[in-house]
Structure formats: C-alpha cells, structure tokens
UniProtKB/Swiss-Prot annotation:
Cofactors named for this entry: Mg(2+)
Keyword Transmembrane tagged: no
Reaction(s) catalysed by this chain's protein: (R)-4'-phosphopantetheine + ATP + H(+) = 3'-dephospho-CoA + diphosphate
Record-given protein name: Phosphopantetheine adenylyltransferase
Glycoprotein keyword on record: no
Site feature: Transition state stabilizer: 17
Pathway(s) annotated for this protein in UniProt: Cofactor biosynthesis; coenzyme A biosynthesis; CoA from (R)-pantothenate: step 4/5
Species: Symbiobacterium thermophilum (strain DSM 24528 / JCM 14929 / IAM 14863 / T)
Annotated gene: coaD
Family: Belongs to the bacterial CoaD family.
Cellular component, GO annotation: cytoplasm
Binding site for substrate: 9, 41, 73, 87
Any Pfam family matching the protein: CTP_transf_like
Assembly description: Homohexamer.
PANTHER family in the record: PHOSPHOPANTETHEINE ADENYLYLTRANSFERASE
Length: 162
C-alpha cells in the first residue's frame, strides 16, 4: 500500500487543487491532504475553515483524508506514514521552487519521494491568490472553486463590499 501526502495552504481550495487531489487518489492507495501554514503569509481563512472547505470538497473521494500540518512537510509525511509527496505543477511558475523543495525533502529523508503532477490546461492559470482577488472585488468565483468554497468566499467578503 502506498500512502501519499498532497500539501498546500489551500487558501482557498481551487478546482485546480481538487483536480490534483483526485488524480493523486486514483494513483495512490491513500492520500492525506495536508493544510500547511506559512508563517510569512497572513491567510484569509483560518486553518479550521480551510480544513472544513477541503473536507467538503473531497467528501466524494473515499481514500482521501484531510489534516493540518505544522513544521516541515517531510516530517509530517513521515509521521503519517506517507512515502510520496504529491505536488501539482503549473507551467513555468512552479517548477523551479517545487524542484528545489523536492531536492531538499529528498536530502532530509531519502525514503520519501516527490511526485509532480502537471496541472491540466484549464487550471494552469488558476491560483488561490487570483481567486481571493476576484472575490474581494465581488466577482464570481464559481467555476474556479468548489461550490461550498464559493459560498464561503461570498460570506467572507460580503462585509467588505460597499
């Protein structure tokens, strides 16, 4: 049995994230979606809110679980019994950083592999940052994020609209 971790900040989860998670779930026996915190960023949603959105978005995938992760990803992967880290790659912008992180993780634990899944062309332009900006200005996010997440974005930004 091969268990994988699919990490991210998921602030918020997008359809691009969900596509990578679904493809990982078809490839590996079990997938843990890890919600990471980045101390250099101020998130829009709390960890609990992001966990809730991910649980809702992945409830149709039986071999996927969702968990919060602090510290180094490779340590979390080891603690969870994951042998693979799954990362989605968008054209150009993600490769260098993700390759460096994969190399560092391999150096920290040679038993954990990094697997890159290329984003589908329809999601190559998509990022949580773009979704947050659209939502902030009151633009629809349907078709970019799961329906539950779109509702949460509308609720979050309803207070900021004139």
């Amino acid at each position: 049995m091969i268990k994988a971790v699919c990490p991210g900040s998921f602030d918020p989860v997008t359809l691009g994230h969900l596509d990578i998670i679904e493809r990982a779930a078809r490839t590996f026996d079990e997938v843990v979606v890890a919600v990471l915190t980045n101390p250099r960023k101020e998130p829009l949603f709390t960890v609990e809110e992001r966990l809730e959105m991910l649980r809702e978005a992945t409830k149709h995938i039986p071999n996927v679980s969702v968990a919060a992760a602090d510290g180094l990803l490779v340590d979390f992967a080891r603690q969870q019994g994951c042998r693979v880290i799954v990362k989605g790659l968008r054209p150009i912008q993600d490769f260098e950083y993700e390759w460096q992180m994969g190399a560092v993780n391999r150096q920290l634990d040679g038993n954990i592999e990094t697997c890159f899944l290329m984003s589908r062309i329809e999601y190559a332009h998509l990022s949580s940052s773009i979704v947050r900006e659209l939502a902030y200005f009151g633009r629809p996010t349907e078709g970019l994020v799961p329906p539950f997440t779109a509702r949460r974005l509308r609720e979050k930004f309803a207070k900021t609209q004139p």
